[in-house]
Amino acid sequence: MERPEAGGINSNECENVSRKKKMSEEFEANTMDSLVDMPFATVDIQDDCGITDEPQINLKRSQENEWVKSDQVKKRKKKRKDYQPNYFLSIPITNKEIIKGIKILQNAIIQQDERLAKAMVSDGSFHITLLVMQLLNEDEVNIGIDALLELKPFIEELLQGKHLTLPFQGIGTFGNQVGFVKLAEGDHVNSLLEIAETANRTFQEKGILVGESRSFKPHLTFMKLSKSPWLRKNGVKKIDPDLYEKFISHRFGEEILYRIDLCSMLKKKQSNGYYHCESSIVIGEKNGGEPDDAELVRLSKRLVENAVLKAVQQYLEETQNKNKPGEGSSVKTEAADQNGNDNENNRK
């Protein structure tokens, strides 16, 4: 093995880095279809390859240390490879003006190319993704719900009683594969970034595996080619900028942050097209504090689910107690003694 020169790496290490980078890029491409509408589709892959910007200053690193470093890189890559987000924090878009404007945009694109109708996101699904995560079972979902509830006071302290207004203007794409409405520049962006970082930290402290927050780019997806593999087979490989040229600087409206939902990517969507929601937090008040219909439905559903779960748990506990040896007979004996005493009292 050749000794690397000061400040550089040898050819073998260079080939390993290139091979690792290529494998990471292939993995990123394979998972892009499922995550492409999330804000982390453009995460820098250097960390996955163990590449840093720091020069190598220790030229006499032992072979043992090389093995340790290699093992750490493999574990980090394996952890990243096994990580597959299935839940996310969503800021739902409820402003009818924004929804109407996006539907006009979608129809304008479809009129120019009818094939793209299959690439459009339904209006009930419009949202901003704040954080993606992996929750593998019901216990982890409950931990996620607890983390979401803990997030509420941090956000309210950050906003200090003020509304966070999110104005949407203009169109952008991710690699001409995903079309989204841009969040206009302003102080609100920094506030939203801080909320995202706080959410990332809160969920990580609970032991939940979450996505990278440093590449968070808030956006509102309205179309993505990955929704229909048929498009690529029929020659539609990119979103032509000419299709949305008239909307390039269009003002779509403002959304006031009032709710954050913990949603599932995989469970069946609600009847209105919105994602399955495990729990929500309300930030401030909307319309005088009156919850909307969708929120009432979610709260009612959650209450019913909790009631059913408690009833099932109680039934299981009672069944287990009855089946324990000795307890059943003692219960019967106590009941018999009680009946005997009652009969004796009646005779008296």
Curated annotation (Swiss-Prot):
Ligand binding (CMP): T129, H219, L220, T221
Polar residues biased stretches: 330-348
Residue segments, region RI-alpha-binding: 295-319
Binding site for AMP: T129, H219, L220, T221
PKA-RII-alpha subunit binding domain as annotated region, ranges: 294-348
Keyword Cytoplasm: yes
Domain of life from the UniProt record: Eukaryota
Subcellular location: Nucleus; Cytoplasm
Gene Ontology terms: cellular component: cytosol; hippocampal mossy fiber to CA3 synapse; nucleus; protein-containing complex
Keyword presence, Plastid: no
Expression tissues: Expressed in brain, heart, lung, pancreas and placenta.
Stretches for region RII-binding: 296-309
Primary subcellular site in the record, as a coarse category: nucleus
InterPro entries, sorted: AKAP7-like_phosphoesterase, AKAP7_isoform_gamma, AKAP7_RI-RII-bd_dom, Cyclic_Pdiesterase
Keyword terms of this UniProt record: Cytoplasm, Nucleotide-binding, Nucleus
GO molecular function: nucleotide binding; protein kinase A binding; protein kinase A regulatory subunit binding; protein kinase binding
Region: Disordered, residue numbers: 1-25, 316-348
GO biological process: modulation of chemical synaptic transmission
Gene3D superfamilies with a match to the protein in the record: Cyclic phosphodiesterase
Assembly information from the UniProt record: Binds cAMP-dependent protein kinase (PKA). Interacts with PRKCA; only the cytoplasmic form is capable of interacting with PRKCA.
Function: Probably targets cAMP-dependent protein kinase (PKA) to the cellular membrane or cytoskeletal structures. The membrane-associated form reduces epithelial sodium channel (ENaC) activity, whereas the free cytoplasmic form may negatively regulate ENaC channel feedback inhibition by intracellular sodium.
Name of this protein: A-kinase anchor protein 7 isoform gamma
Origin species: Homo sapiens
